[in-house]
Every structure is written in C-alpha cells, then in structure tokens.
Amino acid sequence: MNKETLVQRKIMIALSEAGCIVIRQQSGTFYGRDGQAVRIGFPGLPDLLAVNPKGEAVFLEVKPDHKAHRRPEQIAFINKMKERNIRAGFVTSPEEALEVALK
C-alpha cells in the first residue's frame, strides 16, 4: 500500500469521527475482462468528497506530502470550488483535512 493510500485512509477515519459523511471518489481508466477501456469520473476530480456536520460540501485532493505533483486539472477544480465558497483543498494529513472541512 502506498503512502497516499495510507494518508487517505487516516483522513477518511478522522473525518468520519468528526461527524462528516465521506465518499472516496474513483476516477481514471480501467480495463474490462475483454480489454475494453472504461473511463469513470473526469479529469481533476478530487479523491474525497465529504459533507460536514453543517451540511456543507467538502472536496479534498489527497497528496502524500507537500512536494507531490498537482495536476493542472486538480488545481483548476479546487480553485473553481473555492471561487464558489465551497470548502476544498489539497491535504496531506488528517489535521489538514479537518481544517478544510470544519474550520
């Protein structure tokens, strides 16, 4: 299991314990048994969607550390949400995720 997956799991637990509803979003290209490519989601879709106890939507892109690459589509999505006063951000720890989701 890679570092990003471990961080993501810890974040999901912390958000759940804080009263958030958390959904792990899956996106990318997958291949069926017949080899056919299936694309789900869209470019820039964050890793986690949550609803905090106030009923506010929260979009979180999980990165293993602050040096990890941020794709232009990810940056654009997070910025678009913030422009609309929707809670969103890049996070590397449960503490950062709680800051975005609850503060």
Which residues does each predicted region cover?
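Catalytic phosphate/metal-binding cores of nucleic-acid and nucleotide-processing enzymes, i.e., regions
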Residues: 1-103
